[in-house]
From Swiss-Prot:
Residues 429-439, 639-654, 1588-1605 have a biased composition (Pro residues). Keywords: Calcium, Collagen, Disulfide bond, Extracellular matrix, Glycoprotein, Metal-binding, Repeat, Secreted, Signal. Its main location: secreted. Residues 40-609, 1607-1845 form a propeptide. Residues 554-564, 1187-1212, 1226-1238, 1311-1323, 1335-1345 have a biased composition (Basic and acidic residues). Residues 299-478, 502-572, 608-774, 827-1608 are annotated as: Disordered. Residues 72-237 form the Laminin G-like domain. Residues 610-664, 673-732, 742-801, 817-876, 877-936, 937-996, 997-1038, 1039-1096, 1117-1176, 1177-1236, 1240-1299, 1325-1384, 1424-1483, 1484-1543, 1544-1603 form the Collagen-like domain. Residues 610-1603 are annotated as: Triple-helical. This is Collagen alpha-1(XXVII) chain. It comes from the Eukaryota. The C-terminal propeptide, also known as COLFI domain, have crucial roles in tissue growth and repair by controlling both the intracellular assembly of procollagen molecules and the extracellular assembly of collagen fibrils. It binds a calcium ion which is essential for its function. GO terms for biological process: extracellular matrix organization; growth plate cartilage chondrocyte development.
Length: 1845
């Protein structure tokens, strides 16, 4: 670039002053034309396409969109920004698949926002860039993305490029030095939907907005641009991170008329480096501003040849390289800042021509870049430079030496010219206005001026000695169309205008070859040194000797005088193309004789250029030019001393939550301090820039309140602070902006199950209806065409939570486990082997929001949500006028203590505030030291009624006194001191029904009870699960031939056969003759056990055969396989007493026994330790008045004092030592049970007591009365099967069942026996319709009533349930008789009770006495009679404490005193009688299964209870003994065809073949298992065949039937039915039945009707609908049958039994057909699924998943890690099969989030995920080892559904 200008200068010398400039401007115009016509039209400036042009950013007329704040380096996007446009308006349709994205941005807020997103017309993401904390993700499609480890949320500017080429995405940083390529797994979609939408700053209109500054966002169709993207960065973008931006530069400002009229240095850019460049780039249209052309400075003085002013050549002596680096420091007179920078204007619309400038800058790690419209993509070896926004530059390390200028045009280090349009404005020269003081060196140049660039040296050589610091410039467009006349600029032109001209001979600036001009570096030229200037030049240039700095001398070594106070040395003053008001309107300046610019109109041939001419001679130096404008701002100087503290900035956004602080040390209970006065509101500080951290300065005085500053970047998490006090609630804030769409939440809590309805009364059995007329089977209807697509529905509410993601890839091979026990033979596995559990993957990229799901069912109310996070601060509003001082606002919430600031001045003392509200009671303080004993005060007023104290210690025996008269009742005395622990009292009377208490914990298993009497036979149990096959037994002896078996069960539904082709209709064959009976065959050898055959169709029951002859006793057969576990057998006979078992676990307290005889006095016990005082209980109810006691001895009269004021309650003194335990007194009569007190605090753990010896078993007590009905207990664990009991008595007849709905017509029954002779008809009846009845006979017997239930066996004794909740208080029982009087000792006379005396002072603490010797056991006295109650006596005066007297008669219950102080914990009392029935409590948590108790005896038969509701299916019992063969039952109807079951044991015989010859009687088979109770039998068998009656009268002909249509049946499905019908027809004919033709036709129609029904049934079995009537086995069956099923609720029946036990599940088809079971309630791990159904579901599944979330408050529920013994404190999860998931165990859950370890007074949650390949582990049935709950520590359980696949 400099080369071109040098040639222009030579042209000036050769052809005159004007010809050179004409030639130069022709080059400029031609270059601009090439740049405009041969540029890169496909480069896309996204900001400009979105309407954010630079003219707008610089203060143009068009307003910026809301939420976008322009500033000199680009645009700031706030939360309110919404930029969206059609994709076709932003990106050209010709954009290929190879792209390069060049970005320059700075993030202000950490979030997950997208910088941009391109979505298709269907709202699918096609391309997007997302910034996560620590990562940068580029999305190439809905499910294709690439992540890079680049964090842009660090508050710094980032320049980067992304290359999208083929199957590779490359991120390029550091100007191409750092590249990270990432291959794509699949080919990305290259076509972008032009009808889609382009969003800037977010991924969708509801998403979170990118908040930050964006300088450049360009898209290039050439992917290689990314590797040299710095060459395509705009100048202002390369400078943004070089300077510290100030707040003032971030907002547009107007360069008003003051700037135009007063060209002061401060206004021209020298005083404020941040405002001037913004002005220069802000309004090129209205101001016609040009940009300073700073001088190029060679590093040595060059000799110049000038006829007039050669002696002044030393004034142009440039600086040495060291001084050039020194010019980077700020100086008032330095102009190097703009000399090293170039103003870059935003391209205006439709600018046809451009000016090319270059910018050589200093070397730094970040390489510079140029505008996207660059002409020559060359690298620059220099650092990023300031372009006009910032005020300071980054210091360049002094070790980076500048390269020689000869490398400037080298291919690898050449600078890149920037093409930018300027305003097409004509400028007229005007005389310059003299500039004030800092620019005096510039004014001197108007007289003496030489050209230092092209000079003749004595050696006839011209050279650039070192790397010059060229200036970048921007020339107004006016200069493109003008020819510069001869002016002083022509002598500067070779230096200052060199950057504006391209090299000669360059056709396309984009492909400019690296040329080297001889004017710059001629071959063999001598390099000038820094001392080759003439002495004459030096002497006349300045009185001072030049002091160039050495190359090794840095800017910091240069003195300030060298940098700031040498007017003749810094550089050649910059002659500027000034604004229009500085240029003259005539060719000659009006204030001097020097020519200036002569601006002509457009040249006639601007685009014509001849071949490059030969190199011209150096021209003569021109006259000195006009004084230049003020120089450009100087470079940044050395770091100054640290300034004073700035005013505090505005409060920043809330930082990340700090860790929990250490608990504070509490020296004791702190008294509440007085409420301080409300302080005056503080002044707001000036918004300070985000500067580098300076040295700690002295505290400055408080500044004036400043305007609200820009929100600073989000700070890093602060140091761990102390928790602040709870502040007053602040005023209600304005509603914040609408937040981004949140992630799909967890499923809500499941609702509680509804209460069971009342059992209805059994209905009256209905009358049997008349036989309906059978209809003819209809044709199969063809499947209807699919319906039209419905109109799209409205957007529904947010659907249920999304399903889990796809199953991940197979994980790495895990460690080889220990060999497990040999398992039973498993079922046929599913497709494919499940892979091993993979390692936990990294957190995936947040997926794109899915389509709206189906509307889910309304969930129950969930737990209260956690408080939401604080919203983002809104955009900064315009600063308003300073308002008047407002009233003090309410105090805001107190924040965390900040850093200790400098002490401020003491403010004026404020007014005393009003007393604050009484604070919450503080924590109890530590007990202070005991104070000195104060003087005795005056006797106080009698205190309030005290609470009755505990029983005192017995006193010494007193003398016998005379019995006094009854005294007056005295007032209640003061509250006595807390007594010591009393003795165990007798069992009290039943109290009144208490309030509903909390559910108690599960008690220990009780001791085995006495064997009860035999109970009534129970209801028949359910069908048990098949047991594991047992070992083969020895061959048994051959049994006798068995009797005919009972009716079999309904067979399971067989598999569907393949559909056969429709056969042709065959001719009806004649009935063949009956064959002769064959010879009986020989008995074959017993074959081997065959494999299990496929399950065949259920055959229609054949006719009953005649009973066979009694067979011979058979040989013992081989032991067969162990059959399935049968129902529990009946109770066996009582066995002999077993051996004495081991001592059992301690049982619950037994019932109250009878009063035993008085035992001998026990030994004196040791004094127990005093327990911790319990919490203060509530006041009990006032009891009835007690008996008046005997008058006590009169106490000493106290002095009557005046009534004193009520004193304050003194502090509790320390408890005194317990005194010597006295003789146990007689127990008083227990009072009524008080109200339930509040729950006390958890007491300290007591010492482990010694295991007592087992007592003698007591006599069984009398049978108690039936207790009240207890609350429903939780489902206990399955007990072990009981022994086979003896056969019970026949059960009672059951209720008559309700009449069921009319079932479908069953298949034809078996052939009935011939009926009795019918009676002759008397009258001829009307012709009946064709019926479906059997052979004509008498009416059969009335059907038998329902079979009585099988006698059930006595169930296994269940575990003791958890204690029920405390019942309501019962009514007081009748007063008991006085107990027998105990042995009476020496009774002292009782004194009269005296009046209450004054409370004495508390005595000093006495020494603890030694335990007394053991007393002599006294004789037992005779039992006295109970005395009658005495009359109440009067209260006497208080007497002295008497010695221990004998126990008096039990008095009546006295009035309940006031609530006393909590006493020490007493010993546990005896168990009281059972209370009344309490309210049903909430179901408690499932307790651990207790140990199995010993077998109890048979209890007495109880009264027949009410029929209970249907219970859960019981566990399978052991196989019972074969029962006695029952009577022949009625034949039942054939059952429905069931689904294909799992492969079972050897199947039953197949379909019944044709009737064969009766063979010999076979061996007696093994007795089958007793079957379950069958359905009510159909019509009974016909009776014995009666005598044949005469034929009846012929009936009338029936109505004509419908036309015959051949029915199309599937051969395989209906073959068995046809065969059966044919067999039946053959049997009818063979036995000689003569049916009329009409009857045969009716039978055929009935059979076809049955077949039609069976066909429909088979079709429904093939395609289940998932309804309650037609359930599927699992959800996967529904997905296999119907490929397009919606997720939702369906019904399944895993065991394919009766439809009454179907399960309602949630099917997740998007996850492969998961079957999800919901818990009964989300707060408990309970599932309303029977164990039988669950076992089948486990067999049908191969894996399971379940989530459990624990919401906790200040509670840790999971701790796991090496070396932590605290893992024992973590929660444990019990699986369905009994295994335990726990920390550190064999099975551990996945903890994806553990927020409960944070204890900050807020709710957190810990999420546990259970994924297992063993489905029998799920669902989780209990959560154990949860920490105890207190007022400050709570938890909530949220159990998710268990999903099986």
């Amino acid at each position: 670039m400099g080369t071109g200008f040098a040639r222009g200068a030579r042209g000036t010398a050769a052809s005159g002053p004007g010809g050179g400039f004409l030639f130069a401007w022709i080059l400029v115009s031609f270059t601009c034309h090439l740049a405009s016509t041969q540029g890169a039209p496909e480069d896309v400036d996204v900001l400009q396409r979105l309407g954010l042009s630079w003219t707008k950013a610089g203060g143009g007329r068009s307003p910026t969109p809301p939420g976008v704040i322009p500033f000199p380096s680009g645009f700031i996007f706030t939360q309110r920004a919404k930029l969206q446009a059609p994709t076709a308006n932003v990106l050209p349709t010709t954009l290929g698949r190879e792209l390069a994205l060049v970005l320059s941005l700075c993030s202000h807020r950490v979030n997950h926002a997208f910088l941009f997103a391109i979505r298709s017309r269907k709202h699918k993401l096609q391309l997007g860039l997302q910034f996560l904390p620590g990562r940068t993700i580029i999305h190439l499609g809905p499910r294709q993305s690439v992540a890079f480890d680049l964090d842009v949320h660090d508050g710094r500017w980032h320049h980067l490029a992304l290359e999208l080429r083929g199957r590779t995405v490359t991120m390029v940083t550091a100007c191409g030095q750092h590249r990270v390529p990432v291959p794509l797994p699949s080919r990305r979609d290259s076509m972008l939907d032009p009808q889609g939408s382009f969003l800037l700053g977010k991924v969708n209109p509801r998403a979170v907005q990118f908040e930050g500054a964006l300088c450049q966002f360009s898209i290039h169709p050439v992917a290689q641009v990314a590797h040299n993207y710095c060459a395509h960065l705009r100048e202002r973008c390369r400078q943004v991170d070089t300077y510290s931006p100030q707040v003032g530069t971030l907002f547009p400002w107007d360069s008003g008329p003051a700037f135009a009229l007063h060209p002061e240095p401060a206004l021209l850019g020298l005083g404020n480096l941040t405002r001037t460049p913004a002005t220069l780039g802000a309004r090129p249209v209205s101001r016609a501003l040009a940009v300073t052309l700073a001088p190029a400075m060679p590093t040595k003085p060059l000799r110049t040849v000038h006829p007039d002013v050669s002696e002044h050549s030393s004034s142009q002596t440039p600086l040495s390289p060291a001084k050039q680096s020194a010019r980077k420091t700020p100086s008032p007179s330095s102009s190097a800042s703009l000399a090293n920078s170039t103003r870059v204007y935003r391209p205006a619309a439709a600018q046809p021509r451009q000016i090319t400038t270059t910018s050589p800058t200093k070397r730094s790690p970040t390489k510079p870049s140029v505008s996207p419209l660059s002409v020559t993509p060359m690298k620059s070896p220099h650092a990023t430079q300031k372009t006009g926004v910032p005020s300071f530059t980054k210091p360049v390390p002094p070790t980076q030496k500048p390269a020689p200028f000869t490398s400037y045009l080298a291919p690898s280090k050449a600078s890149s010219p920037t093409v930018r349009p300027v305003q097409k404005t004509f400028m007229t020269p005007r005389p310059p206005v003299p500039s004030p003081q800092p620019l005096r060196p510039t004014t001197g140049l108007s007289k003496k001026f030489t050209n230092p660039t092209v000079a003749k040296s004595k050696s006839k050589t011209t050279s650039w000695a070192s790397k010059p610091v060229l200036a970048r410039s921007s020339v107004p467009k006016t200069l493109q169309q003008t020819v510069l006349s001869q002016s002083p600029v022509s002598y500067l032109g070779s230096q200052t205008l060199a950057p504006a001209l391209p090299p000669l001979g360059v056709g396309n600036p984009r492909t400019m070859p690296p040329t080297r001009d001889s004017a710059l570096t001629p071959a063999g030229s001598k390099k000038f040194t820094g001392r080759e200037t003439s002495k004459k030049t030096r002497q006349k240039s300045s009185p001072r000797k030049p002091e160039p700095l050495s190359p090794g001398k840095s800017a910091r070594d240069a003195s300030p005088r060298d940098l700031t106070t040498k007017p003749s040395r810094p550089s050649t003053p910059a002659l500027v193309l000034a604004p229009a008001y500085l240029l003259s309107s005539s060719p000659q300046p009006t204030s001097s004789s020097f020519p200036f610019f002569h601006l002509l109109g457009p040249t006639p041939f601007p685009m014509l250029m001849g071949p490059p001419g030969s190199k011209g001679d150096c021209g003569l130096p021109g006259p000195p030019g006009l004084p230049g404008l003020p120089g450009s701002p100087g470079a940044r100087g050395p770091r100054g001393p640290p300034g004073p503290y700035g005013n505090p900035g505005p409060p920043g956004p809330p930082g990340a939550k700090g860790q929990k602080g250490d608990p504070g040390l509490s020296p004791g209970q702190a008294h509440d301090g007085a409420k301080g006065n409300m302080g005056l509101p503080g002044l707001s500080g000036n918004p300070g820039p985000l500067g580098r951290k300076g040295h700690k300065g002295h505290p400055g005085a408080a500044g004036h309140p400043g305007e609200q500053g820009q929100p600073g970047p989000e700070g890093s998490p602060g140091a761990k602070g102390y928790p602040g006090r709870q502040g007053f609630p602040g005023p209600v804030g304005d509603p914040g902006p609408k937040g981004s769409r949140g992630y799909i939440g967890l499923p809500g809590l499941f609702g509680l199950p509804g209460s069971d309805g009342e059992r209805g009364l059994p209905g009256v059995p209905g009358k049997r209806g008349e036989m309906g007329r059978p209809g003819f089977p209809g044709d199969f209807g063809e499947r209807g065409p699919p319906g039209l697509d419905g109109n799209p529905g409205e957007i529904g509410l947010p659907g249920p939570p999304g399903v889990l993601g796809l199953i991940g890839d197979t994980g790495a091979l895990g460690p080889v486990g220990y060999p497990g026990p040999k398992g039973m033979k498993g079922l046929m596995g599913g497709v494919g082997e499940p892979g091993l559990k993979g390692d936990k993957g990294e957190q995936g990229v947040p997926g794109v929001s899915g389509d709206p799901g189906f509307q889910g069912d309304k969930g129950s109310h969930g737990l209260p949500g956690l408080p939401g996070g604080r919203g983002k601060p809104g955009p900064l509003g315009k600063a308003g006028d300073k308002g008047s001082l407002g009233f003090p606002g309410p105090p805001g919430p107190e924040g965390f203590p900040g850093d200790i600031g400098p002490p401020g001045d003491n403010g004026p003392e404020g007014m005393k505030g009003k007393p604050g509200a009484r604070g919450l009671p503080g924590p109890p303080g530590q007990l202070g030291p005991e104070g000195d004993e104060g003087p005795m005060g005056p006797p106080g007023v009698p205190g309030l009624e005290g609470q009755p104290g505990r029983k005192g210690f017995p006193g010494r025996p007193g003398l016998d006194g005379s019995k006094g008269e009854p005294g007056d009742p005295g007032r209640p005395g003061p509250v006595g001191e807390q007594g010591l622990m009393g003795f165990i009292g007798l069992v009290g009377e039943p109290g009144i029904v208490g309030e509903k208490g909390d559910r108690g914990v599960m008690g220990p298993p009780g001791a085995p009870g006495p064997k009860g009497s035999m109970g009534h036979p129970g209801t028949p149990g359910g069908i048990g699960n098949p047991g594991e096959p047992g070992p083969w037994g020895p061959p048994g002896s051959r049994g006798l031939p068995g009797m005919r078996g009972a009716k079999g069960h309904r067979g399971p539904r067989g598999p569907d056969g393949p559909a056969g082709e429709q056969g042709s209709k065959g001719l009806k064959g004649r009935v063949g003759p009956r064959g002769r009976p064959g010879q009986p065959g020989q008995q074959g050898a017993a074959g081997e056990r065959g494999h299990s055959g496929a399950k065949g169709f259920l055959g229609i029951p054949g006719p009953s055969g005649p009973p066979g002859a009694k067979g011979l006793p058979g040989e013992p057969g081989s032991q067969g396989p162990q059959g399935p576990v049968g129902p529990p057998g009946e109770m066996g006979p009582k066995g002999p007493p077993g051996a004495v078992g081991e001592p059992g676990l301690p049982g619950d307290s037994g019932m109250k026994g009878d009063l035993g005889p008085l035992g001998p006095p026990g030994e004196q016990g040791l004094i127990g330790q005093r327990g911790e005082p319990g919490l203060e209980g509530d006041h009990g109810p006032v009891g009835p008045d007690g008996l008046k006691g005997d008058r006590g001895d009169p106490g000493p009269d106290g002095e009557h004092g005046e009534k004193g004021q009520e004193g304050l309650k003194g502090e509790d003194g320390s408890p005194g030592p317990p005194g010597i335990t006295g003789v146990p007194g007689r127990e008083g009569k227990p009072g009524k049970q008080g109200e339930k007190g509040q729950r006390g605090a958890k007491g300290a753990k007591g010492h482990q007591g010694y295991l007592g010896e087992m007592g003698i078993p007591g006599e069984p007590g009398p049978p108690g009365t039936p207790g009240p009905k207890g609350s429903r207990g939780t489902l206990g664990p399955t007990g072990a099967p009981g022994r086979m009991g003896a056969q019970g008595e026949p059960g009672l007849a059951g209720y008559n069942g309700h009449k069921g709905i009319t079932g479908p017509l069953g298949p034809p029954g078996p052939k009935g026996e011939k009926g009795d002779q019918g009676e002759d008809g008397k009258t001829e009846g009307p012709p009946g319709p064709p019926g479906d009845r059997g052979p004509v006979g008498d009416r059969g017997d009335r059907g038998e009533p329902g079979d009585p239930g099988y006698p059930g066996q006595e169930g296994v004794q269940g575990l003791r349930g958890e204690p029920g909740q405390q019942g309501q208080p019962g009514h007081p029982g009748p007063r008991g008789r006085p107990g027998p009087k105990g042995s009476k000792g020496e009774e002292g006379p009782k004194g009269k009770p005296g009046k209450a005396g004054p409370s004495g002072r508390r005595g000093t603490q006495g020494l603890q006495g030694l335990p007394g010797p053991r007393g002599v056991v006294g004789r037992q006295g005779p039992e006295g009679t109970a005395g009658s109650d005495g009359i109440p006596g009067r209260d006497g005066r208080p007497g002295y404490q008497g010695d221990q007297g004998n126990d008096g008669d039990p008095g009546p219950v006295g009035p309940a005193g006031r609530r006393g102080n909590p006493g020490v914990a007493g010993l546990p009392g005896a168990q009281g009688p059972p209370g009344f029935k309490g309210e049903s409590g909430l179901p408690g948590q499932l307790g651990p299964p207790g140990k199995r108790g010993t077998e109890g005896g048979t209890g007495l038969p109880g009264n027949q209870g009410e029929p209970g509701s249907k219970g859960q299916p019981g566990d399978s019992g052991e196989m019972g003994f074969p029962g006695v063969a029952g009577l022949f039952g009625p034949k039942g109807p054939p059952g429905d065809i069931g689904f294909k079951g799992i492969q079972g044991p050897r199947g039953p015989p197949g379909l019944m073949g044709k009737e064969g010859i009766i063979g010999p009687p076979g061996m007696l088979g093994p007795s089958g298992l007793p079957g379950p109770k069958g359905d009510r039998g159909s019509r009974g068998d016909l009776g014995l065949q009666g005598p044949r009656g005469p034929p009846g009268p012929r009936g009338r002909p029936g109505p004509p039937g419908p036309p015959w249509h051949p029915i199309q049946f599937q051969q395989d499905d209906l073959g068995a039915a046809f065969q059966t019908w044919m067999d039946a027809q053959g049997a009818v004919r063979s036995e000689g039945y003569s049916y009329p033709d009409q009857l045969a036709l009716d039978q055929g129609g009935e059979i076809f009707k049955t077949l039609h029904y069976l066909s429909n049934l088979i079709q429904s079995i093939k395609t289940p609908l998932g309804t309650k009537e037609n359930p599927a086995r699992v959800c996967r069956d529904l997905m296999d049958c119907e490929q397009r099923m919606a997720d939702g609720t369906y019904w399944v029946d895993p065991n394919l039994g009766c439809s009454s036990d179907t399960i309602e599940v949630s099917c997740n088809f998007t996850q492969g057909g998961q079957t999800c079971l919901k818990p009964i309630t989300a707060s408990k791990a309970e599932f309303a699924v029977s164990r039988v159904q669950m076992n089948f579901l486990h067999l049908l599944s191969s894996e399971g998943t379940q989530h459990i979330t624990i919401h906790c408050l200040n509670m840790t529920v999971w701790q796991e890690g090496p070396g932590r013994s605290s893992a024992r404190q973590a929660v444990r999860f019990r699986a369905w099969n009994g295994q335990v998931f726990e920390a550190g165990g064999q099975f551990r859950p996945e903890v994806s989030m553990d927020g409960c370890k944070v204890h900050d007074g807020r709710w957190h949650q810990t999420l546990f995920t259970f994924r297992t390949q063993d489905p029998q582990q799920l669902p989780i049935v209990s959560v154990d080892n949860l920490p105890p709950v207190s007022s400050g520590k709570q938890y909530r359980l949220e159990v998710g559904p268990a999903c099986f696949l």
